[in-house]
């Protein structure tokens, strides 16, 4: 599995090539009752779902060996009580168990081997003190939300996760599942909420792939088309419009302000260009064009 300090050449896990088929296996293991109403794919799997085939001249996206699933507060708050067991049973049916670090069980990260690939599923959720749902911290850490009465599973709270449920979209892909080929409808974070999550990740951790994912996605969609997607998000006209504007402004005007900013620098580092000025200028140019397009559409 690639680490936070990994570069493009580190992403050689077999799951990178079969991620979507394995992702479908994971989601299908939860059962038909789940639908796409309470979870969405976030993280590094999103670019490959948003862009099925990159335009000529753009290298294929360097995939991820992790599957990040964002769960709704409705699920965590017990309004969908039967789903806890569905998630646990589904993950275990694929040979996954809660990860262990030392003597501590990481109940929001499940790992194992499925179809001869090492699989890692991370369960994420909104910060629970938002949206009129204040409550005390969970038993382990304020960033962890326990799920269900058994204490067997949890979710890790992430910044701006509360934007995802309103901005979840569905994307169909023909994939190779464990049961055969299938056209599967994947629920995933829309571009607007996903960029907010990525911007928050760039702020809070030193993982070069976050910046790479942003630049690659904007390149592959095209800055103008990407801004159209953001402008059409229900978040733009909703109660979270101010948060969306502020977080996107942070991304384009601070994290990608100039070639020495963290965004271009991490993008170049991920591509193993080190401090390569060409890679940094490319990243800056792509995000700057996206920023201009957002401004033209009145998003920022």
Task: Locate the predicted segments by residue.
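Compositionally biased terminal segments of proteins
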Residues: 1-300
